[in-house]
């Protein structure tokens, strides 16, 4: 049997709910989830799960007059159930190195092809940023890397764009790191982690930009459960 996943799109919240189906036969819980999704949204999409290696996205800007501008590459992580966990920070040449090495000219062709598709579909009806989530996976037939060119399109200023702008505006040249979103359910644990990282990775600036170290992107108290932070090395 091949593992599949069902997706329910929640348009207002700009998110996707995932239901993993390890077997073809649906359980009562599976049926309840799918029925609920159909009642709320009218449709679900089902597709075979891939042997994921890396999540990434291409970020664009549409001016609403038929023009699309490529903003950059976003390399990010996701938990097993699909929840976003963070982005890699760094210069575009660093982020693109894996893709250029493994896909060569095909990566540039993909960038151009996706950009043209975005222009035709959204160029005259949408003004703003949008990201196309993609996936590097291993082909089961030969074990080689392949790319799924469109997992979903997010018509908003994505976390990938946030990471892209942080890399461009606030990181020192050649600095690399991670932007992370974490959750801890135990009271006080997030605060303890924050204090530890602040001491273990002291912030070091160069010419007004982050050279290395830890910086929290939100206030952290003893009641905090979610954290957003940058760790540069």
Label every PLM stretch briefly.
Residues 147-181:
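C-terminal catalytic subdomain
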